[in-house]
Amino acid sequence: MRKSLLFVWACMGLVCLMSACKTSVKSKEWKLVWVEDFDQKNSFDESVWTKIPRGTSDWNNYMSYYDSCYAMQDGNLILRGIANHTQKNDTAPYLTGGVYTKGKKLFTGGRVEVCARLQAAKGAWPAIWMLPEKAEWPKGGEIDIMERLNHDRIAYQTTHSYYTHTVSYTHLTLPTNSRV
């Protein structure tokens, strides 16, 4: 039950995390490679984003295609994690929305900026990850730009690889009601 709640809230965090920055800081060292303002009215841009399908891992075993888990509002993509009281043919106790750019948008260098608002809740696991396009995890590695658990006031940044599983680990303590 605890894992279930954690996953549901993680997906909710993904919703909040996917609201990209409206402005960027100019840098001579890095080139901003993409901007997503989520300025569509009814849905996210399906030429770039895909709803994450349900899987068997802790992070995706409650993913759902149901519209009740997704919303566009004031230039923000809102991903929700909800208790499943309405989808009788779906046995998952919780449903969550999540999106990724897999197979549609590839980054090979540059700077990535993300503005996100995270809601703290029991079972929450909001995350912004960079995953390999072709190699399976963990062989292709993973960069956790941000992960936050439950009511933690810490945003974790981690890199994983095939050789060391966790290469580096840092964290940032967040002020209450902060934006990441």
Language-model features: where?
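GH16 jelly-roll
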Residues: T23-L172
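Single conserved hydrophobic/aromatic residue that forms the stacking wall/gate
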Residues: H171-V180
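Bacterial Sec-dependent N-terminal signal peptides
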Residues: M1-S27
